[in-house]
Amino acid sequence: MTIIVTGGAGFIGSNFIFHMLKKYPEYRIICLDKLTYAGNLSTLESVMDNPNFRFVKADICDREAVYKLFEEEHPDIIVNFAAESHVDRSIEDPGIFLETNIKGTAVLMDACRKYGITRYHQVSTDEVYGDLPLDRPDLFFTEETPIHTSSPYSSYKAGADLLVMAYHRTYGLPVTISRCSNNYGPYHFPEKLIPLMIANALADKPLPVYGEGINVRDWLYVEDHCKAIDLIIHKGKVGEVYNIGGHNEMRNIDIVKLICKELGKPESLITYVTDRKGHDMRYAIDPTKIHKELGWLPETKFADGIKKTIKWYLENKKWWQDIISGEYQKYYEKMYGNR
């Protein structure tokens, strides 16, 4: 079995590669990654010498490079993690999101048509559903929830999902899609809420919280997410969408306060900044379908997962300190410096 994992040097993609190489040592895993700001080759250092792993630096929008890889490796399965994924960046510069999230997906679809595969899996997001009101805790996103996007990022992800399903219906490509809630865990790029707060708190820097911090997210430990995708690509029904949620709804401000408590830092570090444009209020996923059909359930409670995550960042400071000392620092100042 040969699997191409696009975006495999990023947060979720790298964790998926670790999971697959450990669980299926006989599989050949190919990582295709452009190595943008969020793709860090040092993340994959532990598997670089594995004879069943190969890294290829290329852009999924580069049709020639993608076709060449398909010709060389004859993959059975494609798992597409490659995407620009930060909402704030999509608001500042939406153009690059169109390129990677839609054009890149189209190139992969065409490669699958041309060379043939047994499964193409698109990793998507619950953000394609829009948001839910804070005063309706009884409401959850299901696979039947209409697409109702709020940001350029979620719009382009939704467009990619629709494209994947169109290729399934038109050309018969064997596809599946998963839509997950907010992930957290090791190797999470420090522009996202949890790693950003951990890094800033450790440096006794301000902890920027949008608005009043009352926005609610459902948190999914990245290892649980990887196990769900593993199940879908092996046992999921072709042409289906599967929601993957963690049953861990938390307000942003409560997460930040919890991180302060775990690190022994004062809540006075919390700084409220101007809210994000079009900030979604609440995300909450109903994962009943994947549980009933594939037997998946999240294993990690947030209280345990956040402790493991903080421990990882404490033990791997060089990984994230190297990141925030470079180009990311310029972006950080742009986003939070004058708020």
Where are the predicted features?
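N-terminal Rossmann-like NAD(P)+-binding domain of SDR-like oxidoreductases, especially those catalyzing
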Residues: 1-183, 308, 313-316, 322, ...
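C-terminal substrate-binding subdomain of Rossmann-fold SDR/epimerase-dehydratase oxidoreductases
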Residues: 3, 19, 29, 58, ...
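Residues that form or flank phosphate/diphosphate-binding pockets in enzymes
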Residues: 12, 38-39, 64, 188, ...
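Short histidine/acidic/glycine/proline-rich micro-motifs that form metal-
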Residues: 35, 182-185, 215-216, 276-277
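Short aromatic-enriched loop/helix-cap "lid" or pocket-rim segments at secondary-structure transitions
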Residues: 41-44, 132-135, 188-191, 255-256, ...
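A glycine/serine/threonine-rich, flexible loop-to-helix segment
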Residues: 47, 135-136, 190-198, 274
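The catalytic Tyr-centered alpha-helix of NAD(P)H-dependent dehydrogenases
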Residues: 137, 149-156, 186, 190-194, ...
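Hydrophobic alpha-helix immediately C-terminal to the catalytic Tyr-X-X-X-Lys motif of short-chain
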Residues: 159, 163, 167, 197, ...
